[in-house]
Regions:
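C-terminal SET catalytic tail plus cysteine-rich post-SET Zn-binding segment of SAM-dependent SET-domain
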Residues: 2-6, 11, 16, 111, ...
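Low-complexity intrinsically disordered segments
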Residues: 20-22
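Intrinsic structural disorder
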Residues: 1-5, 26-29, 51, 205
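Catalytic cores of histone-lysine modification enzymes
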Residues: 25-118
Length: 205
């Protein structure tokens, strides 16, 4: 199953004020964003002050589980919904932000993001990839890991992208490698050839 991170869309609460968080030293940290409705999907995180390039914005928190546990909890195809609160940390560990998660789970995907995810020491952080103005929605490229089961229909359907960027690739799945693109093009060519032969044979009979 493509690993993802779910955004709830059933209810649309009022915009939240920036939330205060305590660091490990006990100091109070005010997050540089607030959560409110987003045009991309459900709710999103919006900057409440200018954010400098390279600034560490927030840590992505949640329950740390195995891939097997995550797959048992969520089935994208069965539910007809990709679950975007799951974040792959390694081959063994996934963070499920539906359990003990924080506001980081509301940061939406974009094919032209202003943030990036960084894994350090088994922890996941969201950093600013470029200067961000007040009021701008924070985004990063989910680039969901492909497991080979995704179809072409899944790309724009189940895993379709609505970021609206000029460079939008139409899916939140990771870009296909050049080799995979060549295999897909060859398969499409074979399907077209078979369909042409079938149509011609049918006409002759």
């Amino acid at each position: 199953m493509a690993r993802s991170k779910m955004k709830p869309e059933a209810r649309k609460p009022e915009a939240r004020k920036p939330e205060a968080r305590k660091t490990k030293t006990g100091a109070v940290q005010i997050l540089p964003f607030a959560v409110r409705g987003s045009k991309i999907a459900g709710r999103g995180a919006f900057a409440v002050r200018p954010i400098a390039k390279g600034e560490r914005i927030v840590e992505y928190l949640g329950e740390r589980v195995s891939h097997a546990v995550a797959d048992a909890r969520y089935d994208d195809h069965k539910g007809g919904l990709h679950h975007t609160f799951l974040f792959t940390v390694s081959r063994k560990v996934v963070i499920d932000a539906t359990v003990n998660g924080n506001e980081a789970r509301f940061i939406n995907h974009s094919c032209d993001p202003n943030c990036e995810s960084v894994i350090e020491g088994g922890r996941v952080f969201i950093d600013a990839a470029k200067p961000i103005k007040t009021g701008t929605e924070l985004t990063y490229d989910y680039a969901y890991t492909r497991d080979g089961s995704e179809t072409e229909e899944d790309e724009t359907g189940l895993y379709g992208c609505r970021c609206g960027a000029k460079t939008c690739r139409g899916t939140i799945l990771a870009p296909l490698s050049q080799a995979a693109l060549r295999r897909r093009a060859a398969a499409a060519k074979r399907r077209h050839h078979r369909a042409h032969v079938h149509a011609r044979t049918g006409q002759e009979s």
